[in-house]
Amino acid sequence: MTDNLFFRLIQNAVGTADGFGPVVPSAEEWSAMNREAQKQTLLGVCFAGVQRVCGAHPEQAVNLPAALKMRWLGAAANIQKRNEVMNRHCVELQEMFDRDGMRLTTFKGQSVAALYGEELRGLRQAGDIDVYVECGREKALEYLRKKDIDNGGWDYVHAHPKIFNDAEVELHYRLSISHDLFKNRKIQEFWGSHVADFFAGKAELPCGEIVCPSDYIHLFYLLHHAFRHLISGGIGLRQMMDIYFAILRRDAGMDARLMKDVNDMGMTRFASASMWVLRTVFALPEIPSLWNADEAEGQFLLNEIMAGGNFGHGDTRFRHPTSRAGKLVEIARRNLHLLSHYESDALAAPFYYIWHFFWKRIQICRMWFRRRA
């Protein structure tokens, strides 16, 4: 019952529902909705739902504890302040790289928040700042070195430069990866053939303009990103909400192409499951030109989302070790229950991390020899 109320609260926030129907949530149910919003990193957006219910149907909010409402209000205000900081840093990054003649685009994060609309964009809980720079790994690391910026550690996909004291930055030189090394070759070729689309959009933030991907690439990327994190640790409803707003923003004339590209990357089952989740949680209407909602796969995906929370951080079914070996063992153990749904990707994930361990050491050796030459 609480899950249904929580979904209804989300629907009030995004404008697909009006109140809770005949139900008047109890104080305990309001507290449970608040806890779930925290777990899913949707506190800010859900507070917009609280405000709508209180404004349009005050009789349904009579059991909302005043102290809880004030804490929720405070959390939403802090989220808005955090978004102001992140927006400013995104514009600063754009200006810095523009001055240095390097093409940079912001994806996920603040550029996705721009899809939420004026009322909700400031209430999306920000994580880090994800940007892509069109120069490759070695040039990106060399750029940071010349700017005297600590790269913060790097891998196959991105570095973590220490540019701001109050915000984490992921500087991507590859947009994303697949854990299946055969699929990874395909996805890198796909990104390579769509580089122009990475820089085709503009996002108007309150403090300035940033470059972002086209709506098409944004939606494809968000699906791929969510699928990858499902395999490597888990996803939450914030990732689903990003996909929801990207679907609303999409050019429907590109739907056939989107379905083909998603199928080519082996993600059709996940996309069909996601459509069921979006219809159940956000009341997304049926879209004949996109995937049919798969209830069986959707139920499995939603169970994973509700059990794990944001990126699986709230999942109590599995351990969360800190050592590399421990993480590898836990990923393998966790992915056993994914085998009947996403076979090749679930099997490939542990081997990807083993491959990456040796790949990085080879790259370090190559960089050392080049500097010595």
At which residue positions do the language-model features occur?
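Conserved NTP-donor binding/palm subdomain of two-metal-ion nucleotidyltransferases/polymerases, i.e.
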Residues: 1-127, 132-373
